[in-house]
Amino acid sequence: MIKSTLIYREDGLPLCTSVDNENDPSLFEQKQKVKIVVSRLTPQSATEATLESGSFEIHYLKKSMVYYFVICESGYPRNLAFSYLNDIAQEFEHSFANEYPKPTVRPYQFVNFDNFLQMTKKSYSDKKVQDNLDQLNQELVGVKQIMSKNIEDLLYRGDSLDKMSDMSSSLKETSKRYRKSAQKINFDLLISQYAPIVIVAFFFVFLFWWIFLK
């Protein structure tokens, strides 16, 4: 089930968070991890991703200048989590698009948006609604291929959410393989082109040595 929702501007300013059970230490820990993740995001980061974090999964979606995070219990359908994020992103954009970009915005200025978060969370927690939404999502878009990483790798082992980082690593590896193959092909080509000439030249040198110098 959905446990918590957090909304941040891309510069790291918290805009809103859902009112949750503050006595749950494990949920508090996940929220702290989200703060760290926000500080690591760059313009090259994936616009949507899933972070595996023990018995939780943290999903996020970026729309315009805003990151939307939802913390769910592990096992909650990912396509529903992203459908939920899309719903709240659309409503937040509709309600505050002219306000949140302003430099005068204060932290958690849009906390009243929690009313919509709670209502939407309740809908996505209803089993019948879950089943209907799940079926609808699969019919319309199927299960999307979304970047998934272990949050421990991200926070403590130097992993990255950058799309370009993964892509460039792959391209580097492909480039290395291509370069090695190209070198071998060029070498084989040189041999096939010049080997007969070298053999003939060697034959005449040997013949000259045999006739005149021996």
Swiss-Prot record:
GO CC annotation, single: ER to Golgi transport vesicle membrane
Species name: Saccharomyces cerevisiae (strain ATCC 204508 / S288c)
Name of encoding gene: SEC22
Quaternary state and interactors: Component of two distinct SNARE complexes consisting of SED5, BOS1, BET1 and SEC22 or UFE1, USE1, SEC20 and SEC22. YKT6 can probably replace SEC22 as subunit of either complex. Interacts with SEC24, YIF1 and YIP1.
Subcellular localization(s) per the UniProt record: Membrane; Endoplasmic reticulum membrane; Golgi apparatus membrane
Signal peptide bounds: none
GO biological process, one term: vesicle fusion
Bilayer topology: Single-pass type IV membrane protein
PANTHER family: VESICLE-TRAFFICKING PROTEIN SEC22B (PTHR45837)
TM ranges: 193-213
GO molecular function terms attached to this record: SNAP receptor activity
The organism's place on the tree of life at top rank: Eukaryota
Sequence ranges on the Vesicular membrane side: 214
Miscellaneous notes: Present with 396 molecules/cell in log phase SD medium. Deletion of SEC22 is viable. Overexpression of SEC22 suppresses deletion of YPT1.
Name of the protein in its database record: Protein transport protein SEC22
Cytoplasmic topological domain residue ranges: 1-192
Keyword field contains Coiled coil: yes
Keyword Protein transport included in the entry's annotation: yes
This protein's UniProt keywords: Coiled coil, Endoplasmic reticulum, ER-Golgi transport, Golgi apparatus, Membrane, Phosphoprotein, Protein transport, Transmembrane, Transmembrane helix, Transport
